[in-house]
A protein has these predicted regions:
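Extended, charge-rich helix/loop segments that form flexible
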Residues: 1-65
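Histidine-centered catalytic micro-motifs
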Residues: 68-77
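C-terminal active-site subregion of NodB/CE4 polysaccharide deacetylases
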Residues: 1-6, 64, 77, 81-178
Length: 178
């Protein structure tokens, strides 16, 4: 491995960005090993919530109340860098597990928000179609038009206040990405 100097804020920023880039190119067990290695080498002690995820019963409650639950991968990788065999597993297995637990069809997929771009492409769009998704939302900002491919939809980011909403609307109507 590479030894990175960590004495200055700039050196730490550079090492962090490089680690993010390297981590985003991995998926599954190799990604987990990479992160575990960093935790070990830095003697980091990260705080984890005891219950950071929703339970199956909470998800079923949402669907009973009319919410749509979509898939988001098994291991949260950058899908553009996942090998073909693992790509299929990320799409299919996350969908299958949700459908089995919720006893309902899962038609929608949301790409993980990566630290490295791109995070989707023609290969991932094809794989999402083969996994039988009807829509997939990317992390690319901007409005969605009728003619856009439903398997690589843009999104308008939520805002905390009216000024943020106003900015999103102005960008949308001026044709800029949000």
């Amino acid at each position: 491995g590479t030894l990175w100097p960590l004495k200055s804020p700039e050196q730490r920023d550079c090492a962090f960005l490089r680690a993010c880039d390297d981590c985003c190119r991995l998926a599954g067990a190799p990604q987990e090993q990479f992160v575990s290695g960093i935790e070990r080498d830095l003697e980091a002690q990260f705080r984890y919530d005891k219950n950071p995820m929703m339970t199956w019963e909470q998800l079923r409650g949402l669907t009973r109340r009319g919410h749509i639950v979509g898939s988001h991968t098994m291991t949260h990788p950058n899908m553009a860098y996942v090998p073909d065999a693992e790509l299929r597993t990320e799409f299919v297995e996350s969908k299958r597990r949700l459908e089995e637990a919720l006893k309902s069809r899962v038609d929608h997929f949301s790409y993980p928000c990566p630290a490295l771009s791109p995070h989707w492409g023609d290969r991932t769009v094809d794989a999402s179609a083969q996994a039988d998704y009807r829509t997939a939302v990317t992390t690319n900002g901007g409005p969605v038009r009728r003619h856009h491919n439903p398997l690589c939809l843009r999104r308008v980011r939520p805002t905390k206040d009216v000024d943020g909403l106003r900015w999103n609307l102005e960008c949308t109507f001026m044709g800029r990405a949000v």
